[in-house]
Amino acid sequence: PTGWLHIGGVRTALYSWLYARKNNGKFFLRIDDTDTSRSTDEFKDSIISALNQLGLKHDNEITFQSQRFSHYIDKVEELLNRDLAYYDKVEKNEKTRETDLALVYDNRLNKDGHVIRFRNQRQNMINIIDSVHGEINFDPKVFFDVVILRSNGVPTYNLTSVVDDIDMEITHLIRGCLLYTSPSPRDRSS
């Protein structure tokens, strides 16, 4: 989560915690704190406190994404080397807000204000097997190439969450139904 924990976040945490307990799994707490406008210490502390007060104990040491920037940059480099990502010069007013992160991050990939985008494949239908909704298919042509590294060298949620899911060997994601009705297929499948 990011920002204030709201009832939808509590519901999703509860469902995730219950699912993990029922299936002898693990409930992980990961704080997406790459967006500093919504990632203050007050927000982080309130999320952790609220989940603890509700008895939703996590099974891991809390993962703070801001502490893994170097690892994310390594993954972006791998994607660039495999031609699965590319540099893109964007206008300043596009969704590449500047951030005032009070931490040191690795900006070795910056090329004169370029962002780095993930290169989506466009040939094969994207099929997802959802435990609630069944099989969901997406036409890859409606997906845009998402920014995975901002021009200031800060990785985006689109990258960090996928890398962490792989590293943490996440097998199930529990998301709100809003993502299935979103006009953006990226939101529905992320």
Residue ranges and their predicted role:
Residues 22, 124, 171, 187-188:
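A very general structural signal that marks isolated residues within well-ordered alpha-helical segments
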